[in-house]
Amino acid sequence: MVPRSKAPALVVACGAIGLALGCGNHGGNGGPTGLGPPGGLANCSAPQFLTTSLVLFENIRFISPLGNLNPPPHTFPTDHLYFYMAVATAAIVAPGDIVVTEVLVQHRTGGGQPDLDDYSVTFFPCADVMIQLGHVARLGTQFSAKVGALDGECAAPYPTGGFTYQQCRKSVNVSMAAGEAIGVTGGTLDVFARDRRVNVSWANPARLSDAVGDFGDRHVACAIDYFVAPIGDQLRSKLGTQGAVRSTPPVCGDVAQDVVNTAAGRWFQPGSPTYPEDPHLALAHDNVVPSLGVFSVGTSIPSLPANVYTFPPVPIGRTNLDFRYVATVGEIICYTVSRNQRVLLQLVSAVRLKVEGIGPGACGDPGTWAFSAGAVEFER
């Protein structure tokens, strides 16, 4: 949810399959970065080492896999799981013997909504793996007393997704035993994981919030993978959304969907910082039904309002071509997508592309496809 400046936001309308949800998190800058394990903590000695579910299994409605799309605050595939609760609030406990290293409170204002405070908690079960919980609605009494006041290191407020956020964080060193109370959820809980032994590929690593850190965006992992059986299997059975289960490997989802020299993956408004994600574009696949292609559109294309636009991709041709096969520079591809839209797409170079929405209808004859002055370019 947060380290060195990624903020959580309670937003709605998650997922390209169209379910309106209370999606959580961020819209700030990058994922968990800049944090390291406490001194003296041993490296991870087994593949699975978490022995207790974060929340009772029966309190989980479903878990949205990695790679959720919810523009504009989450224009890019998200780097965390969303636990959606079957109850209004649920107790959160330590999933194993852990050391908490940071606690953050985030103040949300504006957007025509009541002001909201929620918390993130970062911990290490062993030195190789960092886990962070976002949207903790309230800290447990005993845990809060150990942490103390959260009014010291406060960042400047910043806007994203129609809200204004301010974060205040505190470095701590609090050991907890498996099952010890951390706090309670609201309707959702964000669960991030970073594993310094894992390396994921990005088309432009310079665009990462932390290109070199042991627990930055190069090291995104799935927290469920660290739970022992049968807990891990039970949690995996919840991966999906209401009415749909993710069955395509990797069932925990996929964050890094960049394919070099193709249209697939993350694209940036030229000259804009990586975060917030609002002005950017992702050409990806749905995190629950990955057979669906998705245009995840931020705020920079006047002809395509910020939203997700889905289509059934094909491996050849010039209509609805899977982004991973859009590799010919200068060739225009047409897409008939959801929300009664057509989209034109063209690779201008290996690191630059052009996009425009052209309204309803069939794609028709490629000889008629042409961009107007309203087309927008993005870069890797």
Annotate each predicted stretch with a short phrase.
Residues 189-211:
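Short, compositionally biased
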Residues 34-127, 175-178, 187, 212, ...:
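Surface-exposed, glycine-biased beta-strand/turn segments
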Residues 24-27:
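Bacterial signal peptide processing site
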Residues 20-22:
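C-terminal motif of bacterial Sec signal peptides marking the signal peptidase cleavage site
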Residues 95-168, 189:
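Zn2+-dependent peptidoglycan hydrolase active-site motif and core
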Residues 314-380:
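Beta-sheet ligand-binding and adhesion/scaffold domains
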Residues 1-12:
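Bacterial N-terminal signal peptides that target proteins for export
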Residues 163-186:
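Beta-rich strand-turn-strand
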